[in-house]
Structure formats: structure tokens, C-alpha cells
Amino acid sequence: MKLFGVSGDRDKFRKLTSHPQQVLGCELFESLDGDMRGQRMLRIRNGEIEIEVLVDRGFDIGRVLYQGIPTQWVSPAGFRHAHTFTPSAIEPDGWGWLRTWQGGFLSTIGIDHVGGPKSTPNRHLHPGITAERRFTGGFISLSPTTIEKVDVNWEKGTIEVIAKVRQAAAFAEHLVLTRKISMNFGESTFKLSDFIQ
């Protein structure tokens, strides 16, 4: 493999670095200021590629840097914590999601509604609710995440993170998205898989 202009295997790179985290690692951190205040993020580093996972935004992928170059688009709203979103207070017509949509490398849409705002017949189990208004984008990217696994294995040269995102409401849906992101040392790619229950 070739990394930062140097050819070699994992053992060679181990000798060239004082700590494996220089080229292979994963850190959980939290933003302390501005619109992102309180947002937890995972920064995953694998040689020449680095990704930033927005833990409290449905485990979406915010930034992806390849050789230090950003590959994502960021909306004019910028990166924001989901708690800044109040759809009924900001945009009563259902488009308020766009005020907090950060763009990024991957924004999860749905998982039970995609497209623009609309009203649907009741699917709640509560007799007092006769219709439901769905807003643009759905709820999942506004949902916090439970991190199930973070495994950085220098011996195998792998990184794997698994998280669960739950979208639920009383008398309504209870959906769980399990997202896995994995990388192999020295490869400039990552794999993402989703499973919905």
C-alpha cells in the first residue's frame, strides 16, 4: 500500500510512527460553542482519509477529508445540532427542516417519509389523532444515537463503528436504524451499511 507518498505494509508504518493513532484512530468529542454546541462527533482517521460522524444527527457523515481536502458540500445553514430544530415554531408549512439541514457527505432522509411536507391519514394508535403532518426529510437525521461499538484494531488494520438510531413516538412508529461504518487500513474508502427494524 502507499500512504502519504510512502510504500509499505502495516509493519513498516508502525515503525515510522510513534503511536498508531497518527494514522489509524477514532475519537469521540463534543462541540462546545455555536450552533453545534452539545453535538457529539466521532472523528475516524485511516491514513489519508478522515471522516466525521455526527452522532446526534442520526449518525450521518458530516465531513470527509481525503488527503486533507474536504469532499462534502455544506449548506448555508452550516453544521447544527438537532436541538436547534423546532419545525412548528420556525416553518409551519413543514419546510423547517431545511433550516437545520447541514448538507455534509451523507444526510439520512426518512426512514418512514421522504419528499416534501404532506398530510397523511392517521396511522397512530390513538383515536384522537385523525391525520399526521410529515415534514421534509423525516425525523431520523434529527435523532440522537446510541454508540454500540467502536473497534480500532491495529493488528488487523481495521476500524468498525456500530450505532443505533431510534425513531419512536407514543401511539405511533418504533423504528430502529442500525448503522455500521468500517474501514481497512491504507484504503481510501469506507463501507457503510444500514439495517432497519
Kindly give the residue locations of the regions a language model identified.
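Surface-exposed acidic/polar loop and edge beta-strand patches at domain peripheries
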Residues: 1-191
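A conserved active-site cap/scaffold subdomain adjacent to cofactor or substrate pockets
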Residues: 193-197
